[in-house]
Amino acid sequence: IGWQGKWANTLRLWEAQPTTMFDLERFNRGDYAAAAEPEALARTLSRVLYPDDTTYQGKELRLKQEFFLTSAALQDILRRFKNRHSDLRALPKYAAIQMNDTHPAIAGPELIRLLMDENGMGFGDALEVAQQCLGYTNHTLLPEALERWATFTFGNVLPRHMQIVERIDAWH
């Protein structure tokens, strides 16, 4: 319970679940490992947070995890907002989204993507809403704590977000 015993914050715990549990056709062909692969890969997103990223696969999984957790939180914020309000351009009056590390930095492009692609907002309005809603604080300047993604990896894992980042760069 928070300030003056009147407020409680909600803690959301996200779990990745597969869209297909088991490929019976592959199983019946004798490819047992491949039959279970879609489920195993999906659950890997939320099974162990922040894997060793010294390999390309580790870097890719980490980026997927950061996207998954950030997107889930943003989608929940938008869902709750739309239950009470009709104009998403008013979101900054009701939501302040604070990022306290580099891990959720994908929130900018993801919020813009959700507003544009899922809710039909134009780029200029979506960018303005994101700028007004999102805040960022980092508590260290150590290079190893400041995450960066190779353009190839980022574009391969999140091609739509790469387009949005390039559009933001061109806008400014």
Describe these PLM feature segments.
Residues I1-H172:
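A conserved ligand/cofactor-binding region detector
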